[in-house]
Amino acid sequence: MASELHVDAIKHSGGTSAMTIDSSGRMTLPAQPRFLVTLSSNTTVPDGHDQDWSVSAASWTEKFDVGGCFGSGLFTSPVAGVYHITYQMYCNPSAGSYIGAGMNGTAITDTYGLTNLWHFQAGGNDTGFTHTALVDVAAGKTIQFGTYGNGSSTARTDGTFIYGYKIA
């Protein structure tokens, strides 16, 4: 025999709302981890591999950060689960050069068995690319966002951002 539970909201015993279901069946999860940050100012992409560029060279403007997942250029999973992470860079590499972006850290190593996930784009004039990954991680795992440049380049504020959210 099947049972039905008729509720409008689910809350923690302390009163924190965990989930709301409206009359159409749409759910809201107000505490579900998610973040969006944008590059605060145009930033040099160094020649060669800079594994921790998001931490050491770039500064970020936080648009939102539910769950405190992003700080000082580093994503940290606040709770275990599967996260969708996107890193987009818009820059102007010099002619004949290329630009790359990497994701590395314990979340990448645990999920993919790799130290870095890479994405490369040919240079010359303005170029942009998006680098996306799913990670299945325990709480406290991290991702930092790196670059790999060949020639001079500048990451631009009008198209460089990082976002992520927990999907399961």
What are the language-model segments listed below?
Residues A2-P30:
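Beta-strand-rich receptor-binding modules of extracellular spikes/adhesins
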Residues A18-T20, L74, L134:
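Short, surface-exposed charged micro-motifs
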Residues D22-S97, T115-Q121, S153-A168:
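Terminal (often C-terminal
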Residues G81-C91, G128-H131, K141-Y148:
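Extracellular beta-strand-rich recognition modules
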Residues G96-I108:
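Short, surface-exposed beta-strand/strand-loop-strand elements in extracellular ectodomains
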Residues Y112-T130:
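Extracellular carbohydrate recognition and processing domains
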Residues V135-A139:
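Surface-exposed, short loops/turns at beta-strand junctions within beta-sandwich domains
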